[in-house]
Each structure stands twice: as structure tokens, then as C-alpha cells.
């Protein structure tokens, strides 16, 4: 079950005090979130050249080594800090395949892209049902959504990611999934119905 915002604040403090295992538990709780962002941060031409899990592992390793530089105190600040690290990892990966783009500009562009992807996760929550209460929202909803999506079947997760996070219309989603537009829309409806209780149990 996804930790609450208050649990995360305590875990951040334990990690700062170098309690054994605390930093690993803390960073691992963002793994699904970062994996989803890594996928949306790679365009179609690069998705076959990189495993998002490898990019996330690289980002989490860097975060572990640099945790002393983190100055935030809550879940949202840590999620933002990790997005910045992931953006740099993505920029480094892209640099190996593409040249002529200034690195600093690429990192800023990717950082904005990941921020937009994180915001798009909120729209998935809105589509799946009523918004959570303000007390529940203390936990970063992008992290909650990512953990819930990880529990769905591959097809259910894929249709939500393609439509909401990659912004594809139903015809494009259908082509990617080898189904008709009508079929993927029905699949999406069932996926959202299954997603909502998975979100609720994490809030």
C-alpha cells in the first residue's frame, strides 16, 4: 500500500538521519512513478532503444548518492527533485543518440516534459472518478496513480498511458494496440472502472 504523506515525511527524516534501510525504502516508493515518467519522456523513436526501468535505476542510484543535497521536507518536493534527476538521466541517454542539441536546453525541455506528464496523471484521476479529499492529497497523486497503474493488467495500463499520458486519440491508440478505436475506448472504460478502487485504497 502506498505510504501516506505523513509517513513519507517521517521516512525522509529517517533517511536524513541515515537510519539503516530508510533511504532505500524511501526512493523505492517512487520507482513506479519514475518508470511511468521515463516512458513518457522517450519519444517513439527512442522507446525501443532504452528500458525505462534502466533509466529509473540510474536516476535512483544518483539520488541515493546525492540525497544530502535534497533540501525539501515533503513528498511533493522529493517527487520534484527526483523528476529533475530523471530529466538529466534522460538527457544523457538522448545525447548518446542525437547531437547538435545543447545539453542544458535539453535538460530544461525534458524537465518541463516530465512536469507536464506528472500533471497529466492528475487528469487520469479526474477521469476515473471524484477527486480525493484535501487530506488525502497530501500524498503526491502522481505517485499514487503510478502505483495503482502498476497493479492493472498490461492492456488496461497501456490504454490509459497511451490516451492520457501520451495524448493519443482513439484511432492512434487503436493502431498501437492492434484494435479498433471503439474497442480501445471500451477497454479504457473498463480500465478506469478497475483503476478507481486501486487509487482509493492508496489514499
Regions found by a protein language model. Name each.
Residues 91, 145, 156, 165, ...:
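DNA-recognition helix of helix-turn-helix
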Residues 69, 84-124, 138, 201:
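Arg/Lys-rich amphipathic alpha helix in sigma70-family domain 2
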Residues 34, 84, 115, 119-161, ...:
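Amphipathic alpha-helical segment used for protein-protein interaction
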Residues 54-61, 76-88:
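Structural recognition of an alpha-helix C-terminal capping motif at a helix-to-coil junction
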Residues 5-11, 28, 47-69, 166, ...:
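Conserved RNAP core-binding helix
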Residues 13-17, 40-47, 58-75, 96-98:
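Sigma70-family region 2
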Residues 27-49, 65-69, 149, 194, ...:
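Amphipathic, Lys/Arg- and hydrophobic-enriched alpha-helical face
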Residues 1-29, 36, 68, 126-128, ...:
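N-terminal module of bacterial RNA polymerase sigma factors
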